[in-house]
Amino acid sequence: MESIEQQLTELRTTLRHHEYLYHVMDAPEIPDAEYDRLMRELRELETKHPELITPDSPTQRVGAAPLAAFSQIRHEVPMLSLDNVFDEESFLAFNKRVQDRLKSNEKVTWCCELKLDGLAVSILYENGVLVSAATRGDGTTGEDITSNVRTIRAIPLKLHGENIPARLEVRGEVFLPQAGFEKINEDARRTGGKVFANPRNAAAGSLRQLDPRITAKRPLTFFCYGVGVLEGGELPDTHLGRLMQFKAWGLPVSDRVTLCESAEEVLAFYHKVEEDRPTLGFDIDGVVIKVNSLAQQEQLGFVARAPRWAVAFKFPAQEQMTFVRDVEFQVGRTGAITPVARLEPVHVAGVLVSNATLHNADEIERLGLRIGDKVVIRRAGDVIPQVVNVVLSERPEDTREVVFPTHCPVCGSDVERVEGEAVARCTGGLICGAQRKESLKHFVSRRAMDVDGMGDKIIDQLVEKEYVHTPADLFKLTAGKLTGLERMGPKSAQNVVNALEKAKETTFARFLYALGVREVGEATAAGLAAYFGTLEALEAASIEELQKVPDVGIVVASHVHNFFAEESNRNVISELLAEGVHWPEPIVINAEEIDSPFAGKTVVLTGSLSQMSRDDAKARLVELGAKVAGSVSKKTDLVIAGEAAGSKLAKAQELGIEVIDETEMLRLLGS
């Protein structure tokens, strides 16, 4: 029995440590799946030895103590957790337990919701006015986050409608959409601030700021999923009915809430959500399944830490632990040196992962990563797997320092890192084989010169056989030379030559984009082409003149200026023009002479349009004298927001920029 007691003590100590890291420090060290495994192991041992259960065991309570920096709010109704199931068999067993426990043969219907990966909060309204908000904390006492919650635009400060209870405590999840998470980390990397490992940590860190002004700058949102206190009023007698009532009063509720009539329908809902998960725009880690009838919920009751009438059906873990066996360095199209962790292969979210990006030297330093470390790997949707954190408590003794190269691993040229930039780059330019391949692939891509039939494998062979060194060499290729490549017959070779000939007729914007100037995407290339009109004017532009172009700041202006100042680049451009690459003469548009509501305005498009393509919309706006930019800044005059508009819309609202929808855009275009 002594060994069992020791196991229980060790498990409880380990779980308490990780609960503290997760709930209090917002710095989890292990994946949720590993925590769940430890909790299951503890619960199984306690079930076999109930005499050894202690009141302070992690199985007997919900979370961890609140931060001392916040005042505390005691929950009038405890905020309990949910039990988890991880496969269909376990869910069906839960379904059977529910059916068996009910005293009548009344049919059970299930209300199914998304299990959001954010921070659980309670919000108290008195006579319809928001008076307080708290985190879950330990389930009994939470942190007072009222000032911060008031900054979240999705949460109404006052409910609207009729028959609002005198006191109503709603519960839900504060979370951060993916677009907002990426923007926060992008800004943090640029300013040297804290980079968050995942949206959940970012949401928690944003909500638990002591300064509400910081929270207000974060694009947090909220979905309501339940009720705590209810006094001086009534609510519907079904869970779904209550959610719909909350929605009528102005509280946000997920539109994916679904009523299922059977266990089979619940499983179908689970698999549909799992399929849609990568496109939701925010993180979820499963679905929550609740008995819909409040009367049946009351019959079923609660266990120590969770209701018997609800369960969380979790998806396969998106995080797993493994070991870093080595770190290698890859060279990209623009010469960026990217460290890649070579991992002990591990299944993450159903995919075998053996590599993970480490981004740059700063990220390696932030993680404190060494070769041989045990790490947490995260893979969400189609995102490239990344190292979330190092499990320092389990660091082996024989780890080695990661040494960033001083010379390019491909061509041996010096590696430089510009002050203020996180990325180190090879200085080899066109002599670097890695850059040559990638820059040529970019040059012929669909949105650049659009050379039909010239895929990556052809470019690889052309470079390896040294048939092509610069983009201009592509237009010197003959069908005879191309037939020497693998799987390239005379007909295919002639088709590629014809495609190259066709690609010579392009646009100034496409040509600029195809050159692969650092940080010049399609929108910036279009802006440069529209502003300067000719290649000669652009080549002669100073850094100050370049910054007059919408969406071009000092960094991009410097990259463009330096690119055209480099003689070898100008020589390649001259060769391309000599080979016949051309585009129409610019149509000079004087915004002052155009009678249009868009004339002279800097406009940004965001979201998807239903009545026309974005390219058509851009072209029409330019015709009417607008300058179409790719990102929102203080220079922006107008944002046109289509469906599923994301971070650009949020930034426009933050800056107080005028926003119109597609319908209004079409009306103005027609006027």
Curated annotation (Swiss-Prot):
Entry's EC annotation: 6.5.1.2
GO cellular component, one term: cytosol
Residues the record marks as active site: 115
SUPFAM superfamilies reported in the protein's UniProt record: BRCT domain, DNA ligase/mRNA capping enzyme, catalytic domain, Nucleic acid-binding proteins, RuvA domain 2-like
Protein name: DNA ligase
Residue sites binding Zn(2+) per the record: 408, 411, 426, 432
Source organism, top-level taxon: Bacteria
UniProt-listed InterPro entries: BRCT_dom (IPR001357), BRCT_dom_sf (IPR036420), DisA/LigA_HHH (IPR041663), DNA_ligase (IPR001679), DNA_ligase_AS (IPR018239), DNA_ligase_CS (IPR033136), DNAligase_adenylation (IPR013839), DNAligase_N (IPR013840)
BRCT domain location: 593-671
Signal peptide: none
An annotated Gene Ontology molecular function: DNA binding
Cofactor (UniProt): Mg(2+); Mn(2+)
Gene3D superfamilies, per the entry: 5' to 3' exonuclease, C-terminal subdomain, 6.20.10.30, BRCT domain, DNA ligase/mRNA capping enzyme, Helix hairpin bin, Nucleic acid-binding proteins
Annotated residues for binding of NAD(+): 32-36, 81-82, 113, 136, 173, 290, 314
Keywords for this protein: DNA damage, DNA repair, DNA replication, Ligase, Magnesium, Manganese, Metal-binding, NAD, Zinc
HAMAP family per UniProt: DNA_ligase_A
Entry's Gene Ontology BP terms: DNA repair; DNA replication
Reactions this protein catalyses: NAD(+) + (deoxyribonucleotide)n-3'-hydroxyl + 5'-phospho-(deoxyribonucleotide)m = (deoxyribonucleotide)n+m + AMP + beta-nicotinamide D-nucleotide
